Structure formats: C-alpha cells, structure tokens
C-alpha cells in the first residue's frame, strides 16, 4: 500500500500542476527530509533493468504491465524518438543504456527501462519514485527564483545519473528549461510527458508549447502486413491539447455545457 512518502510525492506533483510553487516546494521538502535515496547508476547491475522491485527509489507502484508487453508480447518494445535519444550525453549518461536497438533491423531505439519479460513487478502505468521529488522541488524553487536551491537539487540528481558530472549554474528561464529537459530524460515512459506538455503550455511565468507529429502505421488485416503510415500533427497551442468532455457528462448536464473545441485534421501527404 502507499506510504506517507508516496502521498507526499503525489501531492507535490498536484501542487506543481496547479502552479502553486510555494506548496509544491514545501511538500517536496518534507518528502526529501524523510527520504533522499537516489539510486546511483554507476552501481547499476547490467543484468538488471532500472525499474525493478530492487530499486530503492521506488516508493509505490500499482497496476499491470499492459503497456510493457500487452500489445506484442515482447519486452518493452516502444520505439524511442530520436529527439529523446539525442538529449542524453551519449558517452557519460548512464540512462542512455535504457535504450537498445531493434534486433532485426537496428533501425529504432527501443525502451528498456523496465524489467525483463520474466514477470516484472514494477508497473509502467503508475509508479512513484524519489527522483521525481528532486525534479518537483527544483522546478518549484526555480519558479520562485530560488536559483541556488533549484541548482542544488538538479545537480544532485544529475550526479547520480551522469559519469563525472560537472554542474553549470543556471538562472531564470534557462534554469527552468534545463529542469524540464531533465524531467523528460529522467521520467520518460512513466506517464508524465503528456501532462507536462499541457501544463507547460499554460504556465504563467514561462509558457512553452511545441508541435507534435504522430505516426500511425496501418496494416492489411488480411495479410498481417504493413500497408502505409499516416502522419498527424498537433500544432503549438492546438485546442486538442485539451481533452474533449465525455459524452456521458454532456448528456447528464442540465445546463448543456459547450464541448471543448477540436479541429478536424487529416493525415499529411507524402510530400509534407
């Protein structure tokens, strides 16, 4: 069951999403007074995957591994975007070893952050771990212009992830940018990215939005062969960054609230 520390971490995340930087910092501080156990990746066992039941960073995990192997029956085979792979120091960042290559084509990097195919015990759907507390506190401090505190917790996390890490001190928007990049590196495939992108877009102090391109492979159901790929684009600040209201809620509402807008879109052509 969830511990006090797990509840504190989740609460600090909620305050972060609310842009309540003061309470996000207070809650993360309380958590890290209780538990500061970052897993130093220099001591990692190459025979073990990072997120396992032996990882001391994990505070709470719940749910199955359906995202892990439910679609293909294989081990952790979600393709990793090139932009994410390139964020890591290719020589010194231990997290780079989260990603392997497709054994048949070597074309795509695949995520290998979770356990092997032999009955994993840490969920890739819902996990709370200490590293997020460091990032939550660093971000809250940076938003309150406590640059010294923000740099301290960013440095502590990076020292446990990067060989021979030498910290550069950041301030202002550049510091927030570095923390956001570190959050993407550290928490990839743990269910954070979509929520982070949406809250960045409405951040009052340092707003950020980006274009997202998604590829959908279409298969021939009769031959079980790939047919073609459709590319869809979500533009910066697109209304679709906000989910539509469920039909059941709209039908129940007596005031007939308006549906959230959603632009119609078609896949890009081959020349786009």
Give residue spans per PLM region.
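A contiguous binding-surface segment within folded domains or other stable secondary-structure elements
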Residues: 149, 155, 159, 163
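Expand to "…catalyze enediolate/carbanion chemistry for C-C bond making/breaking, isomerization
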Residues: 169
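Active-site-proximal region of nucleotide-activated glycan assembly enzymes
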Residues: 138
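Structured, solvent-exposed acidic/aromatic patches
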Residues: 1-131, 143-149, 153, 172-174, ...
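Alpha-helical junction/boundary sensor with strong preference for TPR arrays
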Residues: 34-36, 161-164, 183
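Long, intrinsically disordered, low-complexity segments
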Residues: 172-272
């Amino acid at each position: 069951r969830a511990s006090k520390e797990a509840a504190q971490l989740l609460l600090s995340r909620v305050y972060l999403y609310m842009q309540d930087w003061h309470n996000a910092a207070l809650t993360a501080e309380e958590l890290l007074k209780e538990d500061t156990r970052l897993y130093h990746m220099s001591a990692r066992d190459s025979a073990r995957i990072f997120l396992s039941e032996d990882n001391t960073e994990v505070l709470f995990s719940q749910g199955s591994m359906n995202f892990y192997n439910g679609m293909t029956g294989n081990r952790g085979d979600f393709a990793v975007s090139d932009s994410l792979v390139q964020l890591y120091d290719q020589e010194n960042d231990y997290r780079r070893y989260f990603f392997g290559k497709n054994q048949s084509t070597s074309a795509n990097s695949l995520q290998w952050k979770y356990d092997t195919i032999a009955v994993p015990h840490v969920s890739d759907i819902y996990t709370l771990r200490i590293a997020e507390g460091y990032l939550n506190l660093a971000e809250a401090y940076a938003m309150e212009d406590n640059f010294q505190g923000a740099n301290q917790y960013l440095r502590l996390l990076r020292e446990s992830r990067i060989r021979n890490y030498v910290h550069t001190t950041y301030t202002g928007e550049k510091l927030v940018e570095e923390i956001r990049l570190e959050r993407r590196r550290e928490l990839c495939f743990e269910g954070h990215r979509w929520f982070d992108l949406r809250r960045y877009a409405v951040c009052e102090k340092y707003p950020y939005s980006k274009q997202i391109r998604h590829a959908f492979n279409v298969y021939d159901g009769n031959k079980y062969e790939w047919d073609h790929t459709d590319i869809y684009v979500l533009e910066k600040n697109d209304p679709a960054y906000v989910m539509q209201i469920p039909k059941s809620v709209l039908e129940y509402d007596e005031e007939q609230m308006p549906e959230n807008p959603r632009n119609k879109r078609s896949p890009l052509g081959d020349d786009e």
